[in-house]
């Protein structure tokens, strides 16, 4: 089990670097509208779960984005390996963060309640 402060620092570095790589290095149009919301590392720092959000609510766009991220994960991991100061670069696992859509849904419900009253 890694030191929690070290894991947190490394997660922040991974988030910053992945965001930078998606903006500047990855030319796949499927991943242009991706926002990295957070990164969680496993206890042994071997797996980085990268949570992302997209602006579109369409299921087809979500699938395309997931496929684009998985296709780019090898290049992203290689670039992370040269940027991070760790013995082994963590494996990357991309997961869509649906909290933004959930928050928008809750806001819509509250707005409807206010307009009804």
Swiss-Prot record:
Keywords associated with the record: Cytoplasm, Ribosome biogenesis
Lipid metabolism among keywords: no
GO MF assignments: ribosomal small subunit binding
Pfam families given in the database record: RBFA
Gene Ontology biological process terms in this record: maturation of SSU-rRNA
Main subcellular location: cytoplasm
GO cellular component, one term: cytosol
Coiled-coil regions listed in the entry: none
Subcellular location: Cytoplasm
PROSITE patterns in the cross-refs: RBFA
Subunit structure: Monomer. Binds 30S ribosomal subunits, but not 50S ribosomal subunits or 70S ribosomes.
Function in brief: One of several proteins that assist in the late maturation steps of the functional core of the 30S ribosomal subunit. Associates with free 30S ribosomal subunits (but not with 30S subunits that are part of 70S ribosomes or polysomes). Required for efficient processing of 16S rRNA. May interact with the 5'-terminal helix region of 16S rRNA.
Family: Belongs to the RbfA family.
Protein's recorded name: Ribosome-binding factor A
Organism: Leuconostoc mesenteroides subsp. mesenteroides (strain ATCC 8293 / DSM 20343 / BCRC 11652 / CCM 1803 / JCM 6124 / NCDO 523 / NBRC 100496 / NCIMB 8023 / NCTC 12954 / NRRL B-1118 / 37Y)
Gene: rbfA
């Amino acid at each position: 089990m890694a030191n929690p402060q070290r894991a947190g620092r490394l997660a922040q570095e991974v988030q910053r670097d992945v965001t930078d790589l998606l903006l500047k290095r990855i030319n796949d149009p499927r991943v242009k509208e991706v926002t990295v919301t957070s990164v969680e590392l496993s206890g042994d720092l071997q797996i980085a779960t990268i949570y992302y959000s997209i602006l579109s609510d369409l299921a087809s766009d979500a699938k395309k984005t997931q496929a684009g991220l998985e296709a780019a994960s090898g290049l992203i991991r290689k670039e992370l390996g040269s940027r991070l100061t760790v013995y082994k670069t963590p494996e990357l696992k991309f997961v869509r963060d649906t909290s933004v859509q959930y928050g928008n849904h809750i806001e819509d419900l509250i707005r409807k309640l206010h307009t009804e009253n």
